[in-house]
Amino acid sequence: MRLLVSVRGPVEARAALAGGADVIDAKDPARGALGAVSAERLAAIRRTVGAARPVSAALGDAHDEVTVAAAAAAAAGAAFLKLGFGGVTSEARAQRLARAARRDAGAATALVLVAYADWRRATSLAPDHLLAVAVETGAAGLLLDTAWKDAPLFALVSPDAVAAWVAAVRAAGLFAALAGSLSGADFATARAVGAELVGVRGAACVGGRKGRVSEARVAALQGLVRAPPSPTLSLGVLA
């Protein structure tokens, strides 16, 4: 399992790097769950990180093909782009939006579709329906996140349900990532359900998700990611 840390600028990127994050994710928490940073800010983050780690970027929630394509083109060159579908309830429309992002991101940049655990509240597609969209559009992976940040992922969806979703994603040949107000205490559960990547913002910050990324907090989280799995941990005791 790998650790993704969301940063809003080059200063935080340096802290995340120094703390040992595996993926540096460009995101503006003031603009929502998938708030995009400016093209200039993304470029500064990429210069700071260089070749040391992969850089991902949030594109926000998709609304129309022109805007999505422009955002993807501006972020081209990142290792992967995260695209949400808040307000999108049609699989056909989601496919059109995902294809627009994939086309303009370029062949070297992968696309990760973001499903919301609180999908009804976000007026979005259910996570299993978004898996079908990902398969049809050639996405590289799926991230299960929360649109609203007032409850953590495993408070909204049981570990057993997440495990079944992760298994379906991986069976389709895609990578499965988890986020959504996760703390270090959730990492053992994330590992047990089969997640390949965990994404955090608030847990890595001093002062919450709108605070600043702390090198020490990232290092502590990475220690939990790398900790050997507990032989006694199972989904049966987590459910």
Residue ranges and their predicted role:
Residues A51-F154, A168-A172:
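Conserved anion-binding
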Residues A16, L142, A190:
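Conserved, mostly hydrophobic/aromatic
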Residues V23-L34, A76-S90, G141-D150, V193-R217:
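Glycine-rich phosphate-binding active-site loops on the catalytic face of alpha/beta enzymes
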Residues R2-D22:
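N-terminal basic/disordered segments at the start of proteins
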Residues G32-V49:
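Glycine-rich, positively charged N-terminal anion/phosphate-binding segment
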Residues A13, L42, V68-A71, L131, ...:
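Generic hydrophobic/aromatic pocket-lining and core-packing "Φ" positions
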